[in-house]
Each structure stands twice: as C-alpha cells, then as structure tokens.
C-alpha cells in the first residue's frame, strides 16, 4: 500500500460543476455500501483513470489539485472515505478522513 499523503500535499480529484456549485466526485461501492472520493497522486493518473469512471450525462467534470487536508475535511464532513487510486483504478490506500481530522485538532 502507498503511504498516506502528507496533510499539506496536493492530490488530484475529479470535480463536478467546476467554477460553479462545484463538488468533489464521490462514488459508492454498492456491495459494501462504502462511499468514497477517488484521489490520485498525479494529475496524469487522475486523467487516465477518470476516463473509465462513471459519470452523469450532461454534467461537466474537471481534474483539479486540492490540498489533502482540505479534501479530508470535506470527506469527513460528508461521510466519505478517501481512496488513493492509481491510473488503472487500483486502490493504493484506503483512508478514513476522520482519523486525519482527529490528529490535527
């Protein structure tokens, strides 16, 4: 498993409705009921994997860089885990953002 990103490091995520009422793209594993935000170590990995991710027709998406701690805060507030994926969609790390939030308080 890949190491967890540092709080201050950049990760890459898909954003829905960029520039407007934007939000991070979250997915759910229907079998386990786990909701997660896919994140990537590099923009290239994010773009390569995003091509194969489910999307809603008619919505705009964009890959954006975000500070890992900011992503963790939003994920925790909305009940999502963070999965660090590679370009093929393989899970490199599963992160519970509530553990990150707890360590920063």
Task: Please annotate each region the language model reported.
Residues 1-105:
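Conserved NAD+-utilizing ADP-ribose enzyme module
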């Amino acid at each position: 498993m890949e190491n967890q990103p540092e709080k201050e490091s950049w990760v890459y995520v898909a954003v829905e409705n960029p520039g407007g009422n934007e939000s991070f793209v979250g997915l759910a594993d229907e079998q386990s009921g786990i909701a997660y935000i896919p994140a990537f170590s590099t923009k290239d990995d994010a773009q390569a994997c995003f091509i194969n991710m489910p999307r809603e027709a008619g919505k705009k998406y964009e890959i954006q860089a975000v500070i890992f701690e900011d992503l963790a805060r939003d994920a925790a507030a909305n009940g999502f885990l963070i999965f660090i994926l590679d370009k093929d969609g393989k899970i490199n790390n599963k992160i519970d953002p509530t553990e990150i939030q707890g360590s920063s308080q």
